[in-house]
Amino acid sequence: MNHFELFDLPVALDIDLVALKANFLKLQQLHHPDKALDKDQALIMSSDINQAYKILSQVDSRAAYLLSLKKQDHHLDQSIHDFEFLQSALEIREQLDEADSQEQLITLKNEVKQWVDGLIREFKIDYSDEDWSEARDTVRKLRFFQRVLNDIDKAEDQLLDEDSFDLDDDF
Protein backbone atom coordinates (compact mmCIF):
# COMPACT_ATOMS: atom_id res chain seq x y z
CA MET A 1 0.00 0.00 0.00
CA ASN A 2 1.45 3.37 -0.96
CA HIS A 3 1.10 6.57 1.08
CA PHE A 4 -1.76 7.89 -1.03
CA GLU A 5 -3.74 4.68 -0.58
CA LEU A 6 -3.04 4.74 3.15
CA PHE A 7 -4.83 8.08 3.40
CA ASP A 8 -7.48 7.21 0.80
CA LEU A 9 -6.25 9.90 -1.60
CA PRO A 10 -5.67 9.90 -5.36
CA VAL A 11 -2.10 9.35 -6.53
CA ALA A 12 -1.47 12.93 -7.62
CA LEU A 13 0.52 16.03 -6.83
CA ASP A 14 -2.64 17.99 -6.05
CA ILE A 15 -4.31 16.48 -3.02
CA ASP A 16 -6.87 17.70 -0.51
CA LEU A 17 -4.68 18.69 2.45
CA VAL A 18 -7.73 18.94 4.74
CA ALA A 19 -8.68 15.34 3.89
CA LEU A 20 -5.06 14.28 4.38
CA LYS A 21 -5.04 15.80 7.88
CA ALA A 22 -8.44 14.31 8.77
CA ASN A 23 -7.44 10.83 7.58
CA PHE A 24 -4.10 11.16 9.39
CA LEU A 25 -5.86 11.92 12.67
CA LYS A 26 -8.28 9.01 12.19
CA LEU A 27 -5.45 6.58 11.44
CA GLN A 28 -3.39 7.84 14.37
CA GLN A 29 -6.32 7.31 16.69
CA LEU A 30 -7.04 3.87 15.23
CA HIS A 31 -3.41 2.71 15.53
CA HIS A 32 -2.42 4.47 18.74
CA PRO A 33 0.06 2.23 20.63
CA ASP A 34 -1.64 2.89 23.98
CA LYS A 35 -4.92 1.45 22.68
CA ALA A 36 -3.56 -1.58 20.81
CA LEU A 37 -3.19 -5.17 21.94
CA ASP A 38 0.03 -5.54 19.97
CA LYS A 39 1.83 -2.38 21.06
CA ASP A 40 4.96 -3.07 19.02
CA GLN A 41 2.98 -3.47 15.80
CA ALA A 42 0.90 -0.39 16.60
CA LEU A 43 4.07 1.61 17.23
CA ILE A 44 5.47 0.57 13.85
CA MET A 45 2.17 1.42 12.14
CA SER A 46 1.97 4.76 13.94
CA SER A 47 5.52 5.59 12.83
CA ASP A 48 4.68 4.62 9.23
CA ILE A 49 1.57 6.82 9.34
CA ASN A 50 3.61 9.77 10.66
CA GLN A 51 6.25 9.32 7.96
CA ALA A 52 3.66 9.04 5.19
CA TYR A 53 1.86 12.14 6.46
CA LYS A 54 5.10 14.11 6.59
CA ILE A 55 5.91 13.14 2.99
CA LEU A 56 2.47 13.93 1.59
CA SER A 57 1.97 17.17 3.50
CA GLN A 58 4.72 19.05 1.60
CA VAL A 59 4.62 19.51 -2.17
CA ASP A 60 8.35 18.90 -2.67
CA SER A 61 8.41 15.58 -0.83
CA ARG A 62 5.07 14.60 -2.39
CA ALA A 63 6.54 15.18 -5.87
CA ALA A 64 9.65 13.17 -4.95
CA TYR A 65 7.40 10.39 -3.65
CA LEU A 66 5.46 10.35 -6.92
CA LEU A 67 8.78 9.86 -8.71
CA SER A 68 9.66 7.03 -6.32
CA LEU A 69 6.41 5.26 -7.21
CA LYS A 70 7.59 5.31 -10.83
CA LYS A 71 11.12 4.22 -9.78
CA GLN A 72 12.43 7.58 -11.02
CA ASP A 73 13.65 9.10 -7.75
CA HIS A 74 17.36 8.42 -8.25
CA HIS A 75 19.87 11.28 -8.14
CA LEU A 76 17.47 13.70 -6.44
CA ASP A 77 20.32 14.85 -4.22
CA GLN A 78 22.41 16.01 -7.17
CA SER A 79 23.13 19.70 -7.53
CA ILE A 80 21.03 21.97 -9.69
CA HIS A 81 22.86 22.94 -12.89
CA ASP A 82 20.41 25.54 -14.22
CA PHE A 83 22.52 28.73 -14.15
CA GLU A 84 19.56 31.13 -14.38
CA PHE A 85 17.80 29.34 -11.55
CA LEU A 86 20.96 29.41 -9.43
CA GLN A 87 21.29 33.17 -9.98
CA SER A 88 17.67 33.70 -8.94
CA ALA A 89 18.14 31.41 -5.95
CA LEU A 90 21.17 33.41 -4.83
CA GLU A 91 19.21 36.66 -5.13
CA ILE A 92 16.34 35.23 -3.08
CA ARG A 93 18.75 34.04 -0.37
CA GLU A 94 20.33 37.51 -0.29
CA GLN A 95 16.89 39.13 0.03
CA LEU A 96 16.12 36.81 2.93
CA ASP A 97 19.42 37.60 4.65
CA GLU A 98 18.82 41.34 4.26
CA ALA A 99 15.12 41.31 5.23
CA ASP A 100 14.57 43.18 8.46
CA SER A 101 10.83 43.75 8.46
CA GLN A 102 7.67 41.68 8.37
CA GLU A 103 6.65 43.41 5.13
CA GLN A 104 9.88 42.41 3.37
CA LEU A 105 9.44 38.81 4.49
CA ILE A 106 5.82 38.72 3.32
CA THR A 107 6.84 40.13 -0.08
CA LEU A 108 9.62 37.56 -0.37
CA LYS A 109 7.31 34.73 0.70
CA ASN A 110 4.81 35.73 -2.00
CA GLU A 111 7.60 35.79 -4.60
CA VAL A 112 8.77 32.33 -3.54
CA LYS A 113 5.20 31.00 -3.63
CA GLN A 114 4.91 32.23 -7.23
CA TRP A 115 8.09 30.30 -8.07
CA VAL A 116 6.66 27.22 -6.37
CA ASP A 117 3.38 27.53 -8.28
CA GLY A 118 5.32 27.67 -11.56
CA LEU A 119 7.41 24.65 -10.57
CA ILE A 120 4.27 22.71 -9.65
CA ARG A 121 2.90 23.37 -13.14
CA GLU A 122 6.24 22.29 -14.63
CA PHE A 123 6.34 19.10 -12.57
CA LYS A 124 2.81 18.11 -13.61
CA ILE A 125 3.75 18.48 -17.28
CA ASP A 126 7.07 16.64 -16.85
CA TYR A 127 5.39 13.87 -14.87
CA SER A 128 2.54 13.35 -17.32
CA ASP A 129 5.01 13.42 -20.25
CA GLU A 130 7.26 10.98 -18.35
CA ASP A 131 10.14 13.41 -18.79
CA TRP A 132 11.84 12.02 -15.70
CA SER A 133 15.05 14.03 -15.95
CA GLU A 134 13.14 17.32 -16.01
CA ALA A 135 10.77 16.10 -13.28
CA ARG A 136 13.76 15.29 -11.04
CA ASP A 137 15.26 18.71 -11.74
CA THR A 138 11.96 20.34 -10.82
CA VAL A 139 11.84 18.39 -7.55
CA ARG A 140 15.33 19.66 -6.70
CA LYS A 141 14.11 23.22 -7.26
CA LEU A 142 10.96 22.61 -5.22
CA ARG A 143 13.14 21.32 -2.37
CA PHE A 144 15.23 24.47 -2.50
CA PHE A 145 12.16 26.69 -2.30
CA GLN A 146 10.64 24.61 0.49
CA ARG A 147 13.81 25.23 2.52
CA VAL A 148 13.56 28.95 1.71
CA LEU A 149 9.92 29.02 2.85
CA ASN A 150 10.90 27.28 6.08
CA ASP A 151 13.68 29.83 6.59
CA ILE A 152 11.27 32.70 5.93
CA ASP A 153 8.94 31.27 8.58
CA LYS A 154 11.85 31.12 11.04
CA ALA A 155 12.82 34.71 10.21
CA GLU A 156 9.21 35.83 10.75
CA ASP A 157 9.17 34.09 14.12
CA GLN A 158 12.44 35.79 15.08
CA LEU A 159 11.08 39.20 14.13
CA LEU A 160 7.94 38.55 16.15
CA ASP A 161 10.03 37.47 19.13
CA GLU A 162 12.18 40.59 18.85
CA ASP A 163 9.09 42.80 18.56
CA SER A 164 7.36 41.21 21.53
CA PHE A 165 10.31 41.59 23.90
CA ASP A 166 12.07 44.88 24.13
CA LEU A 167 14.71 45.46 26.80
CA ASP A 168 13.38 48.99 27.22
CA ASP A 169 9.96 47.69 28.23
CA ASP A 170 8.85 48.47 31.77
CA PHE A 171 7.98 45.43 33.80
Curated annotation (Swiss-Prot):
Superkingdom, taxonomy of origin: Bacteria
Stored SMART domains: DnaJ
Gene Ontology biological process terms, A to Z: [2Fe-2S] cluster assembly; protein complex oligomerization; protein folding
Entry keyword set: Chaperone
Gene Ontology MF terms in the entry: ATPase activator activity; protein-folding chaperone binding
Domain J intervals: 2-69
Record's function text: Co-chaperone involved in the maturation of iron-sulfur cluster-containing proteins. Seems to help targeting proteins to be folded toward HscA.
Subunit structure: Interacts with HscA and stimulates its ATPase activity.
PANTHER family, alphabetized: IRON-SULFUR CLUSTER CO-CHAPERONE PROTEIN HSCB
Family assignment from sequence similarity: Belongs to the HscB family.
Descriptive protein name: Co-chaperone protein HscB homolog
Provenance organism: Acinetobacter baylyi (strain ATCC 33305 / BD413 / ADP1)
